[in-house]
């Protein structure tokens, strides 16, 4: 009895170890993403070698399946044939390149003598990139990495990254079945095309979702693009947020009859500061290069663009140009004393900016109409654009819409271009921008990869 109990205990312990090894093997296969029942690992299924001064892990296994009829002649006279070996790229193991050396079962038809292999769900047909590695490539493409960097991280080629990127469908607003209430329009310097150096971009002004990117910004291209949307959708657009571009005004008459223009508030301030800055440069160059006037007007130009209410009137700092202690307000007074025209222009833009900050449309337009006569003609002429866009400025003061989101997208595009060292193909740039912006992209079914 005691011997029999010992034998039973030994047998039970052996079975437990076998189960433990089997469970461990399954967990390792689960980490590798190789849990299919038809995948059978070899006895020594993991091998580590060095190729071209690089550590490579090789996972060895066999893919078995059954086949009852010939796909060519439908004959039932089918037998197994010698397996076909495939080297499949899978995600890195311990940060090193990993290959799956897979033997796929082949079959031969005795009637037509044709051979074929069974389908393997680990890899697309006629490809050596596994589905898991393709998904990992897309995760990297979602981040702002260059294609060559992704290829280096995953031990693949740049063209492989490009092919995988193009095999993913992008759900965009190009279905032409929806337009938002607020439409933001702008242009950016992207890829030089036949239409020009500038590309067009538009997005939803409320949820900041990218709508589309066009290779050109001409009026004919914009009208032909937006006319693809139904009239019902085009009538839903109530506001067009844009800079002071005259060509965009014609879009309202031709495409969006119910929309009104909203001038972006940033461009209003930018136009004011730019005009004053150009006048400052003209006046500065009237003085000699080594004079205190030119040096100080050139050095402290930011103080002249600063709001007078934000100037420090208490803290004294030594100024080596004037050899005395001055506050910011006193320094600005010194600069304005160099030229009377500069002083009048400064007072004018300060009144204009105060009206802008208070969103007082009437006071803003009164300042434009009553611009001082002693100011140069070129300076006054540049403010005539506010009269042409007075309705858009009114909407900018009364509504809260702006092009802040689209300007941020333009900055993101600059970063994408800089990381990629520029783009030569417009479609590749457009696709990458939409992937990084998360424009409703979803991968297609595994079998279509």
Task: Give the residues covered by each predicted segment.
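Short, flexible, glycine/charge-rich loop motifs used to bind or transfer phosphoryl groups or to couple energy/partner
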Residues: 60, 172-173, 190, 227-231
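Active-site beta-loop-alpha junctions of metal-dependent nucleic acid enzymes
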Residues: 126-129, 210-233, 239
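Active-site cores of enzymes that catalyze phosphoryl transfer or operate on phosphate-rich substrates
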Residues: 196-197, 201, 213
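Acidic/histidine-rich catalytic cores and adjacent linkers
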Residues: 10, 63, 67, 72, ...
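Short, positively charged, Gly/Tyr-enriched micro-motifs
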Residues: 2-3, 7-11, 87-183, 187-194, ...
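Short, surface-exposed amphipathic charged segments that create phosphate/polyanion-binding patches used
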Residues: 198-200, 273-284
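Short, conserved DNA-binding cores of transcription-related domains
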Residues: 2-120
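Gly-rich Lys/Arg/Thr-decorated short loops/hinges at beta-loop-alpha junctions or inter-strand turns
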Residues: 119-120, 203-209
């Amino acid at each position: 009895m005691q011997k029999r109990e010992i034998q039973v205990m030994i047998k039970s312990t052996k079975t437990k170890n076998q189960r433990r090894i089997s469970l461990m093997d399954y967990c390792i296969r689960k980490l590798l993403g190789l849990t299919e029942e038809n995948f059978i690992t070899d006895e020594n299924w993991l091998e580590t070698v060095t190729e071209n001064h690089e550590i490579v892990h090789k996972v060895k296994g066999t893919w078995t399946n059954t086949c009852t009829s010939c796909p060519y002649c439908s004959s039932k006279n089918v037998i197994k044939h010698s397996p076909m070996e495939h080297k499949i790229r899978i995600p890195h193991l311990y940060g090193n390149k990993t290959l799956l050396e897979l033997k796929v079962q082949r079959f031969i038809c005795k009637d037509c003598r044709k051979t074929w292999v069974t389908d393997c769900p680990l890899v697309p047909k006629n490809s050596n990139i596994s589905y898991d590695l393709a998904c990992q490539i897309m995760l990297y493409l979602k981040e702002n990495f260059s294609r060559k960097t992704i290829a280096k991280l995953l031990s693949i080629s740049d063209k492989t990254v490009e092919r995988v990127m193009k095999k993913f469908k992008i759900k965009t607003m190009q279905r032409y079945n929806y337009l938002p209430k607020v439409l933001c329009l702008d242009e950016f310097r992207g890829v030089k095309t036949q239409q020009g150096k500038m590309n067009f971009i538009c997005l939803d002004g409320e949820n900041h979702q990218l709508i589309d990117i066009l290779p050109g910004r001409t009026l004919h291209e914009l009208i032909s693009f937006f006319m693809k949307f139904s009239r019902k959708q085009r009538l839903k657009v109530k506001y067009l947020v844009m800079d002071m571009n005259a060509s965009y005004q014609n879009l309202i008459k031709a495409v969006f009859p119910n929309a009104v223009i909203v001038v972006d508030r940033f461009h209003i301030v930018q136009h004011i500061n730019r005009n004053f800055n150009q006048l400052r440069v003209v006046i500065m160059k009237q003085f000699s290069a080594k004079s205190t006037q030119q040096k100080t007007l050139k050095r402290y130009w930011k103080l002249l663009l600063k709001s007078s209410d934000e100037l420090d009137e208490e803290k004294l700092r030594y100024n080596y140009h004037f050899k005395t202690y001055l506050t910011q307000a006193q320094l600005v007074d010194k600069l304005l004393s160099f030229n009377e025209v500069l002083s009048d222009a400064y007072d004018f833009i300060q009144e204009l900016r105060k009206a802008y900050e208070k969103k007082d449309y009437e006071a803003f337009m009164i300042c434009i109409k009553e611009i001082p006569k002693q100011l140069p003609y070129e300076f006054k002429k540049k403010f005539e654009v506010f009269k042409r866009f007075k309705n858009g400025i009114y909407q900018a003061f009364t509504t809260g819409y702006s092009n802040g989101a689209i300007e941020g997208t333009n900055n993101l595009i600059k970063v994408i271009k800089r990381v990629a060292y520029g783009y030569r193909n417009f479609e590749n740039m457009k696709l990458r921008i939409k992937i990084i912006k998360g424009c409703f992209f979803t991968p297609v079914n595994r079998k279509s990869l």
